């Protein structure tokens, strides 16, 4: 990298993005070339793609020595792989983005302007999206709920991770040593001065989204269990409230039966309804407890973020 220039690191992960990678590189390079005062690098992590993405990444790396590639040995998912790319960026400011180009590179100029004003964290927040209406409503509800139940710094609504992060922030993130990191929440937790820049999230350029109901649920629950103990305390509170309610209902039924012994018929329906209700509540909170136990299990195993098969253009930074 050249002498006194600050280095911008563009980081992303990909899985079967062969149709998007070349356009991703060209659009980002075109944007970066507008800032000759900065040098740049790309750090792209591939999750064991099967559609020829790796061949394209190798070609781009051969054409541009600043294009660094991490080839994972397996698909390590949408949480760990992009975070590993961020952790391996060497730039003075690190940009986290998506390889499907839903985060338009042209927004970078607004992000950089805020960064140069002295902000350590500049988050791009969606003002508009082309997502399904119902999905967007669910997302807004989730962020609203997470904001209400989180005791500390709040996760920004509409923030997907796209933004600029100063090197001091990256070094702070490395101290977490979290094998399953919730990046958006960690950015809120480190506490550096943060500003937001609204942007319109574009449609995926080519191909289909790799997110499904499971991956969205995984991300949502990871955010909850990493940032609040309220669901566990709700389980205790519900247990107490429902226990008291059960005693009161039992007492009322007993009194009514004493008063109208021959005419008051208890019936089967209240028993069945009560059984299903209490069983549902129990299963719900057993599931909540299971999520927290799963998070603890992930932590205590202390496994690496990813297993890397190969690195390209990381001279002096690991195996090539």
Regions found by a protein language model. Name each.
Residues 70-74, 78-88, 93, 105-183, ...:
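Acceptor/aglycone-binding surface of glycosyltransferases and processive sugar-polymer synthases
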Residues 2-7, 182-320:
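Hydrophobic helical membrane-anchoring modules
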Residues 18, 25, 105-108, 159, ...:
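Membrane-embedded alpha-helices of multi-pass transport/permease systems
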Residues 62, 87, 113, 117, ...:
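Solvent-exposed polar/charged
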Residues 1-132:
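Structured catalytic core of nucleotide-sugar glycosyltransferases
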Residues 15-19, 102, 106, 174, ...:
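Residues in soluble alpha-helical coiled-coils and helical-bundle/repeat scaffolds
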């Amino acid at each position: 990298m050249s002498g006194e220039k600050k280095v911008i690191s563009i980081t992303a992960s990909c899985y079967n993005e062969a149709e998007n990678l070349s356009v991703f590189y060209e659009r980002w390079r075109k944007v970066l070339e507008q800032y000759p005062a900065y040098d740049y690098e790309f750090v792209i992590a591939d999750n064991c793609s099967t559609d020829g993405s790796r061949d394209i990444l190798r070609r781009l790396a051969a054409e541009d020595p600043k294009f660094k590639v991490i080839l994972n040995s397996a698909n390590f998912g949408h949480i760990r792989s992009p975070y590993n790319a961020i952790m391996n960026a060497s730039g003075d400011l690190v940009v986290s983005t998506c390889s499907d180009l839903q985060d338009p590179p042209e927004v970078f100029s607004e992000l950089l302007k805020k960064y140069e004003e002295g902000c350590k964290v500049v988050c791009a927040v969606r003002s508009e999206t082309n997502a399904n209406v119902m999905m967007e409503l669910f997302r807004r509800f989730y962020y609203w709920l997470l904001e209400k139940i989180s005791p500390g710094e709040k996760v920004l609504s509409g923030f997907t991770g796209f933004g600029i992060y100063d090197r001091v922030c990256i070094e702070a993130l490395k101290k977490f040593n979290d094998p399953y990191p919730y990046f958006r929440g960690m950015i809120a937790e480190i506490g550096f001065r943060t500003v937001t820049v609204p942007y319109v999230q574009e449609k995926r350029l080519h191909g289909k989204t790799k997110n499904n109901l499971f991956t969205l649920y995984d991300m949502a629950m990871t955010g909850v269990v990493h940032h609040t103990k309220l669901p566990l305390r709700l389980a205790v509170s519900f247990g107490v409230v429902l226990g008291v309610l059960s005693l009161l209902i039992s007492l009322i039924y007993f009194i009514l039966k004493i008063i109208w012994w021959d005419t008051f018929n208890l019936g089967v329906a209240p028993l069945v309804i009560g059984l299903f209700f209490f069983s549902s509540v129990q299963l719900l909170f057993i599931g909540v407890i299971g999520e927290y136990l799963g998070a603890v299990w992930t932590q205590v195993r202390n496994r690496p973020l990813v297993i890397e098969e190969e690195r390209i253009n990381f001279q002096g930074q690991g195996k090539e």
